[in-house]
């Protein structure tokens, strides 16, 4: 039996990951997020560090004494707002973006690695973005947070290798997916989001991938051990 922990599981890619893990059976699934859920869910608003820490406590409590072949964390939760030139955006939205997209994944990596110290193989899959690797007009917070997550992933991988620990870390850009986050991005004005017409065209042309297909690719690659190696990865290059 393996352990899978998924954040942001109420919609989009996270929901697809959680559904497919649950459907195949045989493994332990825990989800973390602010919406209420079933017995596999740990409720926490990832914008608040204190709630993330409490989620870490609950994770430790729930898996105490259990034996797992491997443990996998999918840091998937994310928000796109605020969108617009930096001087125009709301400070509270800016803070929330950085908290959800950057601070929470790092805190959860920390608690996950502590909680699973006795597991022979541990994997962290941080859902990154192409926006981590190129600037996008109007996305200062999102780009910065995802770029920071890329670097944090590289550091954690380096620390694991330097101590001879079986910890594999991937910061994975999944490509363009048909999710609520994409829909919200298309609602912005051209003044705030210079790429708005390109994003609308991608939707109109039908080139956004269904979240279920992307989740299936990610889970297959994880099962095959193909998310190891270079921590900075792009699903479109390895699927």
List the predicted regions and their residue ranges:
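N-terminal Rossmann NAD(P)H-binding glycine-rich loop of SDR-like oxidoreductase domains
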Residues: 10, 14, 18
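Conserved glycine-rich Rossmann-like NAD(P)H-binding loop of the short-chain dehydrogenase/reductase
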Residues: 25-39
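Rossmann-fold cofactor-recognition segment
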Residues: 38-50
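Substrate-binding pocket helix/loop in short-chain dehydrogenase/reductase
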Residues: 84-86, 93-95
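Active-site helix of classical SDR
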Residues: 109, 145
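Residue(s) in the substrate-gating loop at a strand-loop-helix junction
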Residues: 129
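C-terminal helical subdomain
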Residues: 167, 171-172, 179, 187-239
């Amino acid at each position: 039996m393996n352990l899978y922990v998924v954040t942001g599981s109420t919609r989009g890619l996270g929901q697809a990951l959680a559904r497919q893990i649950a459907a195949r059976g045989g493994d332990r699934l825990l989800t973390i997020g602010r919406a209420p859920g079933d017995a596999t869910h740990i409720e926490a608003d990832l914008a608040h560090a204190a709630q993330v820490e409490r989620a870490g406590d609950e994770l430790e409590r729930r898996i105490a004494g259990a034996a797992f072949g491997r443990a996998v964390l999918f840091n998937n939760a994310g928000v796109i707002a605020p969108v617009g030139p930096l001087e125009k955006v709301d400070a509270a939205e800016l803070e929330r973006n950085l908290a959800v997209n950057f601070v929470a994944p790092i805190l959860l990596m920390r608690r996950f690695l502590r909680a699973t110290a006795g597991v022979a193989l541990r994997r962290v899959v941080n859902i990154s973005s192409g926006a981590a690797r190129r600037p996008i007009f109007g996305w200062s917070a999102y780009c910065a947070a995802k770029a920071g997550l890329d670097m944090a992933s590289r550091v954690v991988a380096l620390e694991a290798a330097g101590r001879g620990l079986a910890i594999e870390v991937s910061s994975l850009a999944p490509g363009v997916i048909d999710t609520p986050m994409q829909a919200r991005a298309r609602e912005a004005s051209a003044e705030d989001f210079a790429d708005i017409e390109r994003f609308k065209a991608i939707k109109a042309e039908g080139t956004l991938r269904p979240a279920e297909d992307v989740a299936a690719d990610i889970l297959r690659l994880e099962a095959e051990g193909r998310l190891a190696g270079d921590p900075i990865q792009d699903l479109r290059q390895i699927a």
